[in-house]
Amino acid sequence: MARIAGINIPDQKHSVIALTAIYGIGKTRSKAVLAEAGIAESVKISELSEEQIDLLREGVAKYTVEGDLRREVSMNIKRLMDLGCYRGIRHRRSLPLRGQRTKTNARTRKGPRKPIKR
């Protein structure tokens, strides 16, 4: 298995799909990295040479991925919560942020129903 950005990339998948195993790399970014490295999208990871894998490592290293990206996202959310802005308050209360209704629905974000005590 090839190891890129600290992640074991699946060998038997096409290179476009295999690169999406890295957090922060989707199909579009995967295609861009492959085009920059000059590797065909249909080639499987197991068929790549060590030099080509090194090119992929360099291409992926240009982006914020994996732990750094997760940390950046969590710090952004923490910043919103510390500011006390509307979005930060909604994060703190575990409610939807983007204007969805909450009288009904929003069960995923709010969690299971709480029984009414009489």
Curated annotation (Swiss-Prot):
Residues spanning the signal sequence: none
Assembly, per entry: Part of the 30S ribosomal subunit. Forms a loose heterodimer with protein S19. Forms two bridges to the 50S subunit in the 70S ribosome.
Keyword Protein biosynthesis among UniProt keywords: no
Any GO CC annotation of this UniProt entry: small ribosomal subunit
Protein's recorded name: Small ribosomal subunit protein uS13
Matches recorded under SUPFAM superfamilies: S13-like H2TH domain
Keyword line: Ribonucleoprotein, Ribosomal protein, RNA-binding, rRNA-binding, tRNA-binding
Gene3D superfamilies linked to this entry: 1.10.8.50, 30s ribosomal protein s13, domain 2 (4.10.910.10)
GO terms (BP aspect): translation
Similarity remark: Belongs to the universal ribosomal protein uS13 family.
Gene: rpsM
Statement: the UniProt record of this protein carries the keyword Transcription regulation: no
Recorded GO MF terms: rRNA binding; structural constituent of ribosome; tRNA binding
Region (Disordered): 94-118
Transmembrane segments: none
Known function: Located at the top of the head of the 30S subunit, it contacts several helices of the 16S rRNA. In the 70S ribosome it contacts the 23S rRNA (bridge B1a) and protein L5 of the 50S subunit (bridge B1b), connecting the 2 subunits; these bridges are implicated in subunit movement. Contacts the tRNAs in the A and P-sites.
